């Protein structure tokens, strides 16, 4: 059986599924699916654009986020100078997946913050971070696209009360929120004096948000080269 030959010398053997897969690839090529996707052509899915064109922001987010690199790097430098050593991300699903991936790939870089991700309501895990992290040296990242995720808001209430008992009226300075414009979390951030509220583009789904603020804020705290990361993502696109 002959191998399928793709671009850049790629070859693949698909066994008994080869004919079906080759036919599907040919159909994708004939219908210009890739080029239409990058043009955000909603007719790839449905004849009407509702709930499609406003979910394709991930296609060009690597280019769009380049202008925010300096801001994120300056914020990280400021946090390090203030003595922050740990970062605890409070989030579920798409809001936590990219940070977890970045941490596993790059690890905790010396001289930057150690990143921890709390994406479980297991009482033992919540208590572990409550007991092991010093609130004076910990930055809490509250990450939810909708600003209504019950688990994340429960984490926020728990850890805010914990930090407030230890630090007092300036507890909000230990918190950063990442959310969509207009979400309830924006009001929370203003009310409780959060250090910063990052507003991510609303046309990106949670699981496609790796190169938005949801992924890049934690990446900056880890000391990852954001310019290089976004450059490589842009090339890949």
How would you label these PLM feature ranges?
Residues 2-80:
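Extended, charge-enriched "interface" segments that sit outside catalytic cores
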């Amino acid at each position: 059986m002959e191998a399928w030959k793709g671009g850049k010398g790629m070859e693949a053997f698909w066994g008994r599924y080869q004919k079906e897969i080759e036919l599907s690839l040919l159909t994708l090529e004939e219908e210009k699916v890739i080029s239409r996707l990058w043009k955000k052509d909603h007719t790839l899915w449905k004849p009407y654009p509702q709930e499609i064109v406003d979910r394709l922001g991930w296609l060009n987010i690597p280019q769009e986020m380049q202008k925010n690199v300096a801001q994120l790097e300056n914020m990280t430098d400021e946090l390090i100078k203030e003595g922050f050593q740990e970062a605890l991300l409070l989030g579920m699903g798409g809001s936590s997946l990219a940070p977890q991936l970045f941490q596993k790939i790059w690890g905790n870089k010396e001289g930057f913050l150690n990143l921890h991700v709390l994406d479980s309501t297991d009482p033992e895990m919540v208590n572990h971070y409550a007991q092991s992290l010093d609130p004076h040296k910990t930055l809490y990242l509250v990450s939810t696209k909708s600003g209504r995720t019950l688990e994340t808001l429960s984490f926020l209430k728990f850890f805010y009360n914990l930090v407030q008992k230890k630090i007092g009226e300036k507890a909000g300075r230990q918190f950063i929120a990442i959310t969509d414009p207009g979400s309830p979390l924006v009001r929370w951030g203003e009310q409780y004096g959060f250090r910063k509220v990052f507003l991510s583009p609303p046309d990106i789904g949670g699981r496609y948000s790796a190169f938005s603020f949801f992924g890049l804020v934690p990446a900056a705290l880890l000391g990852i080269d954001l310019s290089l990361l976004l450059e490589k993502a842009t090339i890949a696109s």
